[in-house]
Swiss-Prot record:
Composition bias type Low complexity, residue spans: 139-175
Superkingdom: Bacteria
Keywords (A to Z) from UniProt: Ribonucleoprotein, Ribosomal protein
Keyword Protease recorded: no
Name of the protein described by the UniProt record: Large ribosomal subunit protein bL17
Biological source species: Mycolicibacterium paratuberculosis (strain ATCC BAA-968 / K-10) (Mycobacterium paratuberculosis)
CC per GO annotation: cytosolic large ribosomal subunit
Gene Ontology molecular function: structural constituent of ribosome
Subunit structure: Part of the 50S ribosomal subunit. Contacts protein L32.
GO biological process annotation, one example: translation
Assigned protein family: Belongs to the bacterial ribosomal protein bL17 family.
Region of interest (Disordered), ranges: 123-186
Disulfide-linked positions: none
Length: 186
């Protein structure tokens, strides 16, 4: 059962408010973001989010329910074919309201309402964590054999502070085959 809205109506009458919200929602779905007054943005947010929830379901009944409110068939098509599937894995919070500077003429508070197009922060954080872990895994695997070799080398070689130790270490180090052949030819 429809319940009356508390407080004053946007535009004066309830029919004007319905038309106003339908037009704002049409513009929002068409352009992705709109700049409007803050009270209109706050009234539009739940209205638009309910329409997106209908679009996520995607059934014919839901499409007809949305067509009762938004008369532009092209916008409804975009809503059901692009916007709804984009938010399929998101439970609410499809829009964002950002306050901007007041309007110059009458100093009324303005806001930008937009569709949240980027994925959630948690999914980005999970992806970043997986990438970081995948980078560490090969490095750790490569570092493990080197770590086993390094203690042996540290025990065999004297402290690197001694200058005479460096030539001995170079002499003890195996030379590549090309250098070995070149020195035997001399």
């Amino acid at each position: 059962m429809p319940k009356p809205t508390k407080g004053p109506r946007l535009g004066g009458s309830s029919s004007h408010q319905k038309a106003l919200l339908a037009n704002l929602a049409t513009s929002l779905f068409e352009h992705g973001r709109i700049k409007t007054t803050e009270p209109k943005a706050r009234a539009l947010r739940p209205y638009a989010e309910k329409l997106i929830t209908h679009a996520k379901k995607g059934a014919l009944h839901n499409r007809r329910e949305v067509l009762k409110k938004i008369r532009d068939k092209d916008v409804v098509h975009v809503l059901f074919e692009e916007i709804g599937p984009f938010f399929a894995d998101r439970n609410g919070g499809y829009t964002r309201i950002i306050k901007v500077e007041p309007r110059k003429g009458d100093n009324s508070p303005m806001a930008v309402i937009e569709l949240v197009r980027e994925k959630t922060v948690t999914s980005e954080a999970d992806r970043a964590r997986r990438v970081k872990a995948s980078k560490k895994a090969p490095e750790a695997a490569a570092a493990a054999p080197q770590a086993a070799v390094e203690p042996e080398a540290a025990e065999a070689a004297p402290a690197p502070d001694a200058p005479e130790a460096a030539p001995e270490a170079e002499a003890a180090a195996p030379r590549p085959a090309d250098e070995a052949e070149g020195s035997s030819e001399d």
